[in-house]
Each structure stands twice: as C-alpha cells, then as structure tokens.
Amino acid sequence: MTNKFYSLLLPLLMGVSATGIHAAPAAGTAAGTSATSDDVKYDGPLTIKLGTRVDYQREYQKSELLDEPSGFKGNNLMISIQGNITERFSFRYRQRISQTKSNSSFFDGTDYMWLQYAFNNRWDIRAGKVALEFGSAEYQRDPSEQYVLSDFWNYPPCYKFGVNLGYNLTANDRLVLQAAESSFRTKDNDTYMYTLSWYGNHDWFHTMYSANVAEYRRGKFIYYLSLGHTLNFGKAQINVDYQNRFIEKHDFWKDCTIRGELMVRPNDHFNLVGFGVYTSNKTHDLGPLYITYGSELTRFGGIVEYAPIPEKDTTLKIHAGYSYCYGQEGVKHEVPSRNRHFMTVGVQWEMDIVALAKKIWNKQHK
C-alpha cells in the first residue's frame, strides 16, 4: 500500500516544484461558482444563502423517450450558512432540503457542516462533515451548476465525516491532508479514506490535485490520482481534468476519466460552455459505487447560461443544454448510457438573505 501511495504522490509533488510557490486556493469557475470541495477562504462575518434549480428534461435512448428522467425536475433546494465566530474559529454549513427524506438521516441531506480553527496564518484544522478531497476542476463546481456530470461522479457520495489538516505554503498555495469516512462506507462496512491535496492559484493557471487511498472493504484499497487544471484567458476558461484509478497493477489508461471543457463569457449576461468526457474501466468491478467493468464511454455536449440580473446578492440564471453519450457499457451497467440523448431547459436562483435584508433596510432608513 505504501509504495502505491508514493507513486500517486509523485506527480502531485512534481507539479508543486515545477509550477513554483506563489499562489492561493483555486478560484471558482468562470460562471462564478463556489467550490464543491468546500476548501475556500471566507472573510465575511455571516452569510446565509438560499438557492434552488428547476429543470424541464427530456432523455432518449436512441429514439425512445425515457419516462423516469424526463419531465419537470426540482433540483438542489439548498440553504447555506457560513461565518466567523472569532478571528480563529470559522464555520460552514450547507443543507440540501430536497434530499431530506422521512426514511433517512437528516445528515444524508447535509453536504458539509464543519468547524475550523486557524492556529496561525499557515496551519488550520477542520472537523465535521466535509467534502471528500477528490480534486479536479469539475468536482469544484457548485451542485446547482452541474448539468451533465462525468460518469464517475454519478456514483460515489462526495460528503463524509472527517478531519482536514491544512497548510498554506504561501498566500496562494495550499496543501490539505484529510482522513475521512470512505466513499464506499455503509453501516455494515466501516471503511476510511486518506488524501493529500494541493490547491494552487498561479495567475492564469489554477491546480486542483489530489492523491487518494480509499478502503472499499476493510483492509482492501483502491487508489486515485486526480489532476484538475483551470486556465484563464481573458473571457475564456479551459478546464482539463484527469483521474486515474487502480487496485493492484497500476495503469494510467485502463481505468480513467479525461474531461475537457471550454467556457466563454462574451459579456456579463451570457456563459457558453462546451465539453467532452472519456471514461473507461478495463480492470475491475467494485459494484454499485463504481464504473462497471468493461465500460468505455464518450460524452459530449454544451450549455448556454443567461443571467438577466447579474448581481452579487441575488443570482438568477436561465440555462439550456444538450449532451450525447456513446460507447461500450460495462457488463453490469444498470442504467443504459450509450446512444443516450439528454436535453434540459431550466432556471436557477440563489439569494444572499443577509445582504438582501441589509439592502432593504438601508433603502427604508435613508
């Protein structure tokens, strides 16, 4: 296990030394999204946000309409609270109200709920329910702006209880060591996951790298290497992700996901997105939380976002998108993916309740 983990760390450490040490935690996407990884710096006293998204979707397998995923869909009704208790203590909480069910724990709908203590400007510790440090630019995207996921992200849960130890190499480079419940953990399977992540912000070049060791059964491990890159060029942004997965014999291409994305913002109102994803697993089968053995799928598509009132306190966006998937499905693939068309039109909004209340108060008491 030790030698395999070192082999994962090598590309990460080479990336640190090659890029140089003079940057910060990775910024959001060109669309102004917040980080799913929850590893973002927050300087405000208190923020309370409420947001949701509603879509009208149509999915086809070849020319046959799929009834279950089609129609009106309410997505991601969420409330998030974050703030500073003291100069050293901060907290963050986000609840997906739409995921709270009568037959499940309230925490199943909790994305993250953590308390962080900063020892100094370099070191901090975070504990609670946290985002698993998988890395990649796609993984950083806010759930409300995830229209078409890569096949891998349809399977593992991304939020678990754990502890993060953070170290700021400079104001612009951050390392995170995480010990948390494994994404494979169930009530009958007490397993854990260990991760080293690097977040870099180097002018136009941003990195989100991670090396992971996760138990899929007690004492049995799968290894991940995630390399996420964001490149900013004026009004354009390019996101390139690579994730490698292996259990016994390491191979960079037999079990991997490669994703490329181009985002262009011609003005403050429009965001144009085109993407392509390749996913394969030719090595093993780990059941329902994984890409099935024998899969080799390619997905491409595009999204158009329109923001009629691009304000900081209230975000309103109208979106439309399309994607197509083709290739070879795995031997135990439960949901057919190849020759599948996906179309969506919808609206999303997010409101900063505290900022909006202050704005209304100030207008009434001028």
Language model regions located:
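Exposed loop/turn and edge beta-strand positions of beta-sandwich/beta-sheet ligand-binding modules
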Residues: 75, 109, 121, 159, ...
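Short catalytic/ligand-binding loop motif for oxyanion handling, primarily in non-cytosolic enzymes
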Residues: 134-136, 185-187, 328-329
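N-terminal periplasmic/intermembrane-space "pro-region" immediately following the signal or transit peptide
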Residues: 1-53, 342, 346-351, 356-366
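Contiguous hydrophobic segments
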Residues: 145, 149-164, 171-174, 185, ...
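Aromatic-acidic/polar surface patches that form glycan- and anion
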Residues: 70-72, 108, 187, 293, ...
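Outer-membrane beta-barrel pore domains
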Residues: 53-67, 103, 118, 202-366
